[in-house]
């Protein structure tokens, strides 16, 4: 069995993290030539390319597997070293999360871990349909995803669901939906999406009003919190998690445009197996808090 040299594997990791050889060399305090030599040595060991030399560089499928292995080794080292790490650099935990979880329940869930443990979070925000891919590529050690199936050598648990309501301000509703939400009125009402791959709004309209994708005007805004602001100021109608706008709904600042209709996104927590002690703390914290605030039915 071919075994990786972890010094050379860290060079591969640095090139991916730093998005190039020059910055990787600076990060590792070695020359750029030395970085190239280490990666070439690793590729010779496995007899295949591990890095696609694009701008920025990206790992091959085998490179992804090795980076995933490195993440596991780093966490397991933390578990074995235990108290010997007291006073050293806090452990880096890279997690892939969706913006709506980050804006609502995730940080309160992690608060006990952050208060009790020497860790540094690296939260990589991605759509919940794509977060699992970051785990597959070895970029993170855990991911909040809508995918129910675990990747090979990974664990998965159900967290609960976010229910998305179709909301707007009262002035917006009076302007665009004076006679209620109809197929015709929706064609004129500005909407918003997180990015060009975010299809929740379009899917909701297609499912409930038979509107084809791309038929409504749509802003692109990469911020979950900005969705709320856009709706409050009467700029757009939005799909927003109920958990995020409970106060606005109670006060009447925002209204549910289609009572009884909503989009449900069940969320799952994925991570490598076996879990380190620190990742077990993270898992316990996420599951405990998620089961309290997310829909379980």
Curated annotation (Swiss-Prot):
Q: What keywords appear on the UniProt entry?
A: DNA-binding, Transcription, Transcription regulation
CDD domains (alphabetical): PBP2_IciA_ArgP
User: Looking at the record's lineage, which domain of life comes first?
Assistant: Bacteria
> What terms describe the molecular function in GO for this protein?
DNA binding; DNA-binding transcription factor activity
Q: Which residues bind DNA?
A: 21-40
Which residues does the UniProt record annotate as the domain HTH lysR-type? 4-60
Per UniProt, subunit arrangement is: Homodimer.
The entry sums up its family as follows: Belongs to the LysR transcriptional regulatory family.
* Annotated function: Controls the transcription of genes involved in arginine and lysine metabolism.
Could you tell me what this protein is called?
HTH-type transcriptional regulator ArgP
Task: Identify the species of origin.
Answer: Cronobacter sakazakii (strain ATCC BAA-894)
């Amino acid at each position: 069995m071919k075994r990786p040299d972890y010094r050379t594997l860290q060079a591969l990791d640095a090139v991916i993290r730093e998005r190039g050889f020059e910055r990787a060399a600076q990060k590792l305090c070695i020359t750029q030539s030395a970085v190239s030599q280490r990666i070439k040595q690793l590729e010779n060991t496995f007899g295949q390319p591990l890095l696609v030399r694009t701008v920025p560089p990206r790992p091959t499928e085998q490179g992804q597997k090795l980076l995933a292995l490195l993440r596991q080794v780093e966490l397991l080292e933390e578990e074995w070293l235990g108290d010997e790490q007291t006073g050293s650099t806090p452990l880096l935990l890279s997690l892939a999360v969706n913006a709506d979880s980050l804006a609502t329940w995730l940080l309160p869930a992690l608060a006990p871990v952050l208060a009790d443990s020497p860790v540094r979070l690296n939260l990589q925000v991605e759509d919940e349909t794509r977060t699992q891919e970051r785990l597959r590529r070895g970029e993170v050690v855990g991911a909040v995803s809508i995918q129910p199936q675990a990747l090979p050598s990974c664990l998965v648990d159900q967290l609960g669901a976010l229910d998305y309501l179709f909301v707007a301000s009262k002035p917006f509703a009076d302007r665009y939906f004076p006679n209620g939400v109809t197929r015709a009125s929706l064609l004129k009402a500005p909407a918003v999406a997180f990015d060009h791959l975010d299809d929740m709004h379009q899917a909701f309209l297609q499912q409930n009003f038979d509107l084809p994708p791309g038929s409504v005007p749509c802003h692109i805004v990469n911020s979950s919190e900005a969705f709320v602001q856009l709706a409050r100021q009467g700029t757009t109608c939005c799909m927003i998690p109920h958990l995020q706008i409970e106060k606005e709904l109670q006060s009447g600042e925002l209204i549910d445009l289609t009572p009884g209709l909503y989009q449900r996104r069940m969320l799952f927590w994925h991570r490598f197996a076996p879990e380190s002690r620190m990742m077990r703390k993270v898992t316990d914290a996420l599951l405990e808090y998620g089961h309290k605030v997310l829909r379980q039915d």
